[in-house]
From Swiss-Prot:
It comes from Rhodopseudomonas palustris (strain HaA2). Residues 171-256 form the PPIase FKBP-type domain. Involved in protein export. Acts as a chaperone by maintaining the newly synthesized protein in an open conformation. Functions as a peptidyl-prolyl cis-trans isomerase. It catalyses: [protein]-peptidylproline (omega=180) = [protein]-peptidylproline (omega=0). It is found in: Cytoplasm. This is Trigger factor. Keywords: Cell cycle, Cell division, Chaperone, Cytoplasm, Isomerase, Rotamase. InterPro entries: PPIase_dom_sf (IPR046357), PPIase_FKBP_dom (IPR001179), Trig_fac (IPR005215), Trigger_fac_C (IPR008880), Trigger_fac_C_sf (IPR037041), Trigger_fac_ribosome-bd_bac (IPR008881), Trigger_fac_ribosome-bd_sf (IPR036611), Trigger_fact/SurA_dom_sf (IPR027304). It is an enzyme of class 5 (isomerase). GO terms for molecular function: peptidyl-prolyl cis-trans isomerase activity; protein folding chaperone; ribosome binding. Consists of 3 domains; the N-terminus binds the ribosome, the middle domain has PPIase activity, while the C-terminus has intrinsic chaperone activity on its own. One of its GO terms (cellular component) is cytoplasm. Transmembrane segments: none annotated.
């Protein structure tokens, strides 16, 4: 066998490979000998079929199988000998001329093929002990807890029927039945019976709730609205519609007394227990935001200290996924690049930079994990699946079966766990300094940086 490197351009490599016909023929014969005791042919006793006869009957198919195996093993040897880690699957170019192919299968000609690859660059890892990270810390204050309790009370406030003939005001809850039409023609999903809506909640089409102000029980109104251009249904988006709407109930919001009795309506023993639960939830929320801030700093530091050319094919794949998502989102929201004060060309350039960063950081994190034997256990993956299942009550078995039968989905679930474990490993080595901040500072937008 002969191997000749013909391309060595950056991370791209290409090889011309020659496999002698004699090598192929020898492996075909070995395979036929192995099959001799397993094949049953009329006129021959088990195990007594001559190899020459087997070759006439099965030679072509066995040769094809052998060549496929030889190519895979040869390629693996080429890559292993040179210490290559592949960024993508190798591109193999086999002979296309039918006569040449037949001669190769018949053992009359050598096999000549080319294999092109893109390799992962050698990554020199930084000294993580030199990293410094600032950890923003927010203490959950009594006022934070009180505000959270007020929001809970607002979301769970009671309503009571208004006096007979009373008209609806902003903040009231009106129960309505309606029939919608466009140019006099009813449309799918345009009817509703006894639907409660709080005026001012902005839960209906823009302009709909405002036209309920002043309506009384038993009154019917024609409400005219225009569906937003970014409405989920393309058949309705941007179109004017009319809704014949009848109010069946008008209720006013009641003041909520925040006390033990209110807490009990939420399943808590007392107001103190409700406050404890609210404080714990806020603490978890702040901890999550803190984690994101710390991780952002760490990824930025990894980006700064690991500059190398990322495999172009991986960058292109990442960019393609991002670009498809961006375009779908813009189309759904009815926006253009001009609306975002940019051009398509500028946006492409910016997102290609982001794609390059993501690929490089992914390779760096993978290298760190590999060199430090960081692994995701089956138990950790199982816990992640269970958590996903909990988010879909009543469909737990469906979620479990989906991940059990979908290796790609399971890999997507495993990836962020692996990334977090690598991040935790680096944080153990880095210098982490806590900095007290306000809630507003913790959640302040950081538009000048892009997370991986």
């Amino acid at each position: 066998m002969q191997v000749k490197e013909t391309v060595a351009d950056g991370l791209k490599r290409e090889f011309e490979v020659n496999v002698p016909a004699a090598d192929i023929d020898a492996q075909v014969d070995a395979r036929l000998v192995d099959l001799k005791d397993k094949v049953k042919l009329n006129g021959f006793r088990p195990g007594k079929v001559p190899v020459s006869h087997l070759k006439r009957v099965y030679g072509r198919s066995v040769a094809a199988e052998t060549i496929d195996k030889l190519v895979r093993e040869t390629n693996d040897g080429i890559f292993a000998e040179r210490g290559f880690r592949l960024a993508t699957e190798p591109k193999i170019t086999m002979p296309q001329d039918q006569k040449v192919v037949e001669d190769i299968l018949a053992g009359k000609s050598d096999l000549n093929y080319t294999v092109a690859i893109e390799v992962v660059p050698t990554i020199e890892l930084a000294d993580f002990k030199s990293f410094s990270v600032e950890k923003p810390v927010v203490e959950v204050s009594d006022s934070d807890v009180d505000d959270a309790i007020k929001r809970i009370a607002e979301a769970n406030r009671a309503y009571a029927d208004k006096a007979e003939g009373a008209k609806a005001e902003s903040g009231d809850r009106v129960t309505i039945s309606f029939k919608g039409s466009i140019e006099g023609v009813p449309f799918d999903g345009g009817t509703g019976e006894d639907i409660p809506v709080v005026i001012g909640s902005n839960s209906f089409i823009p302009g709909f709730e405002d036209q309920l102000i002043g309506i009384a029980v038993g009154e019917t109104r024609t409400i005219k609205v225009t569906f937003p251009t970014n409405y989920a249904s393309e058949t309705l988006a941007g179109k004017p519609a009319e809704f014949e709407t009848t109010a069946t109930k008008v209720e006013a919001p009641q003041d909520t007394t925040i006390d033990d009795e209110f807490a009990k309506t939420l399943g808590m023993e007392s107001l103190d227990k409700l406050k404890e639960a609210a404080k714990a939830r806020l603490a978890a929320e702040y901890a999550g935001a803190t984690r994101l801030r710390v991780k952002r700093q760490l990824l930025d530091r990894l980006d700064e200290t690991h500059k190398f050319d990322a495999p172009p094919s991986l960058v292109e794949q990442e960019f393609a996924v991002m670009w498809q998502s961006i375009n779908a989102e813009m189309q759904q929201n009815g926006k253009s690049f001009a609306d975002e004060d940019t051009t398509e060309e500028a946006a492409r350039e910016e997102y290609r930079k982001i794609a390059d960063r993501r690929v490089r950081l992914g390779l760096v994190l993978s290298e760190i994990g590999e060199k430090n034997k960081i692994q995701v256990t089956d138990d950790e993956v199982s816990r992640a699946v269970i958590e996903r299942a909990r988010q879909m009550p009543g469909r737990e078995k469906e979620v479990w079966d989906f991940y059990r039968s979908n290796a790609e989905a399971l890999a997507q679930l495993r990836a962020p766990i692996y990334e977090d474990k690598v991040v935790d490993f680096i944080l153990e080595l880095a210098t982490v300094t806590e900095k007290p901040v306000t809630r507003e500072e913790l959640y302040k937008d950081d538009d000048d940086k892009t997370a991986a």
